Amino acid sequence: MKKLLVTLALGASSFSAFAITPLWLRDVNISPDGKEIVFCYKGDIYKVKAAGGEAVRLTSQDSYESNPVWSPDGKQIAFASDRFGNFDLFIMPADGGTAKRLTMN
């Protein structure tokens, strides 16, 4: 009985540690041609080939960027950012570069 309680206690502590580990990878979106993927990781937007490889960071602001969405032609990426205090919509070239603010929230 004592062995069972120790096993259960260890299992519960392992599970609770896993449950509070933050999931930094989110907002995954596949390009219209299916060749590339954009995603958010720790508040920045990254792009990677769908076939695999090293991800390229597209944003590097102190702000939090999220919800990247491809334009229908795959040439631009729209996303939300709190660069100016509140979340606004921005658009940038799919290969990175200067983002243009679309809304003034």
Residue ranges with predicted function:
Residues 14-16:
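N-terminal signal peptide c-region/cleavage motif recognized by signal peptidases
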Residues 1-4:
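Positively charged n-region of N-terminal signal peptides that target proteins for export
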Residues 18-105:
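Sequence signature of WD/YWTD-type beta-propeller architectures
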